Amino acid sequence: MKIPLRFLLISLVPTLSMSNLLGAATTEELSASNSFDGTTSTTSFSSKTSSATDGTNYVFKDSVVIENVPKTGETQSTSCFKNDAAAGDLNFLGGGFSFTFSNIDATTASGAAIGSEAANKTVTLSGFSALSFLKSPASTVTNGLGAINVKGNLSLLDNDKVLIQDNFSTGDGGAINCAGSLKIANNKSLSFIGNSSSTRGGAIHTKNLTLSSGGETLFQGNTAPTAAGKGGAIAIADSGTLSISGDSGDIIFEGNTIGATGTVSHSAIDLGTSAKITALRAAQGHTIYFYDPITVTGSTSVADALNINSPDTGDNKEYTGTIVFSGEKLTEAEAKDEKNRTSKLLQNVAFKNGTVVLKGDVVLSANGFSQDANSKLIMDLGTSLVANTESIELTNLEINIDSLRNGKKIKLSAATAQKDIRIDRPVVLAISDESFYQNGFLNEDHSYDGILELDAGKDIVISADSRSIDAVQSPYGYQGKWTINWSTDDKKATVSWAKQSFNPTAEQEAPLVPNLLWGSFIDVRSFQNFIELGTEGAPYEKRFWVAGISNVLHRSGRENQRKFRHVSGGAVVGASTRMPGGDTLSLGFAQLFARDKDYFMNTNFAKTYAGSLRLQHDASLYSVVSILLGEGGLREILLPYVSKTLPCSFYGQLSYGHTDHRMKTESLPPPPPTLSTDHTSWGGYVWAGELGTRVAVENTSGRGFFQEYTPFVKVQAVYARQDSFVELGAISRDFSDSHLYNLAIPLGIKLEKRFAEQYYHVVAMYSPDVCRSNPKCTTTLLSNQGSWKTKGSNLARQAGIVQASGFRSLGAAAELFGNFGFEWRGSSRSYNVDAGSKIKF
């Protein structure tokens, strides 16, 4: 049987671990038979004691659960697993199984679950799929001493899930008390929740702690609930060390407290006298959150500086993650107590790399502060940076632009005599995301007076470069200019905003709205062409026709213009009659259904009703020229050269259409990330007029395919308008009315071919647009009053048009006809297809 590589590697881990740890140590295998439940067991619980000087290894062959110890009516005064003072190392090798302690009420045992009296020896728990210490002991045990208590060192390594919850100690370390060094590393999930100590370290008390995340790491709701309590989550003993590395997951301190009822305050970590933080760092993409402050015991400064986001000596790993000190999770009452917002270190602090963020009115206090060019310090208004004994030197100070309107100030203080504050680069206005520039308050100019306050014991040095401000801009939203002005003594800085314009995002712009007028333009021209087509064919005195009509317009996309498509179709009915004077009068009505889309967020559905009136006057070219030349010598010179039989036509046409629009907008507004579909309705209309003339030239030579050549020239005018409207929905916008005007002078030739019962013609024309007003409207985003011009497409002003039509008689009283047209412009293409029948009256 083939063994998958993944399972082979997993099986090798405990094997390799044991080969390193077992040596001459005593080995005992643990299985499900070693589990115990005091509520169901008929025997008393028996603790395991290790005394082998070469050490003891517990090798797990199955999951083990020890719970409800002791049985009702009995007492438990010894740790479930005990390591004697003379014993060697104690190793628990999980082998991928789980190990659980729950409700272990060991009254006087130092470590209800695990206790080790062996100084300078190490207890290791590694390789478990789940490792849990729950209520071991619970706070109901008034003399409990935590879940794990070791006089040497302790390691929690390479476990999938570690949950340490609701444990209690009357001494130090509600869950863990380690006299030596505690190493917690590479655990995929680690949670210390609701543990409590009557003295120091609600969850952990130790001399030296190395905490390295292998996944999300959470310290929540731990407490030292006495007047003398220190370190809600972690307490470091005097002269101890603390190293925190967010290597493979976020680390969160939240809701950890100290103090008796009525004097409760927040505390994440307490550093004993002369204790120090040796490392505070997060890898790229990870963050360490201090929603509770760091406190110190005593006032003795530590010589070693804290280099934030700096690797160990000789390690090339880069730490570019984020360290956050925040008071955001405090209640309004808690935020009023400065202790809940103040983190204090008795070390010099150097920001070496990555980002340090101060939020929610916190105060970060240390001996002094310096900053390398590769790091960023981002401060909310209301936060403070306080140097107690040294100077402050900053190279990359950023102000969180989202906090500008909270009415507070950023404070930098180095008030000790002969100490300076130095800012070597421009202050930066930082934004968390580009949506900031969608805020409606940016619609007006603003000045934020004195939002940066500096207090130095000696000098405030603002370099020449720092007297300007760098703002992270967005290509979308409100556009404007940020400026910074320093007071004469450089103790205060004022930041100002001057609005310039508003640039919509692609989701907000909606160019389809003005482009709908191009759809009306195409439809009304096609309708007018159809009315002209209805007068063609057999020379009936009176005729009635009915047909289907369809149009397609495709506008290609450009760098600054979105592509769109218009498709319409419907029915046309019409009639024409020859009047007593020989003129032809035509009348038509149409109903069209259209669909427009911009290939992005908007789709429009439209319904158009249109009517058209056309009058054509036929005469000979000779009579027309005779009238135009009037009386005089020029008439006598030119008129003899004009054919008296060549037919000429003049015609005029007027059309009107009304359109009802219904637009669908699909958007993805955050939050929640769910697709939203909104519908909006409004109306519009279109007028179109046309004047033209043509001369039909008969091919009498008998040569060539076509029998008649008809050159023509037209003047076409189209005016389309749509009403203003307000769109309501996820993206609410107000669109002003918009219009399109276009004047074209098409000229071309019609080539005709006739048979006994059939008739064809082909038209080729060139149509320049000599005057045009492109569609546009003013759009206002109702959520922030941002306003901009939404411009429709600017179709190329020269068009080449080809049309082909065919007619076939069905006896003396009926006729079928069809037409295909294609229009090409440099930026668009349009097609129309018509087919119908005529009936003679």
UniProtKB/Swiss-Prot annotation:
Ranges in a coiled coil: none
Entries under InterPro entries matching the protein: Autotransporte_beta, Autotransporte_beta_dom_sf, Polymorphic_membr_middle, POMP_repeat
Highest taxon of the lineage: Bacteria
Signal peptide limits: 1-24
Alphabetical UniProt keywords: Cell outer membrane, Cell wall, Membrane, Secreted, Signal, Transmembrane, Transmembrane beta strand
GO cellular component terms attached to this protein's record: cell outer membrane; extracellular region
Membrane topology: Peripheral membrane protein
UniProt-annotated location(s): Secreted, Cell wall; Cell outer membrane
Domain Autotransporter: 537-841
Main location: secreted
Family per similarity comment: Belongs to the PMP outer membrane protein family.
NCBIfam families the UniProt entry points to: POMP_repeat (TIGR01376)
Name the record gives this protein: Probable outer membrane protein pmp2
Organism of provenance: Chlamydia pneumoniae
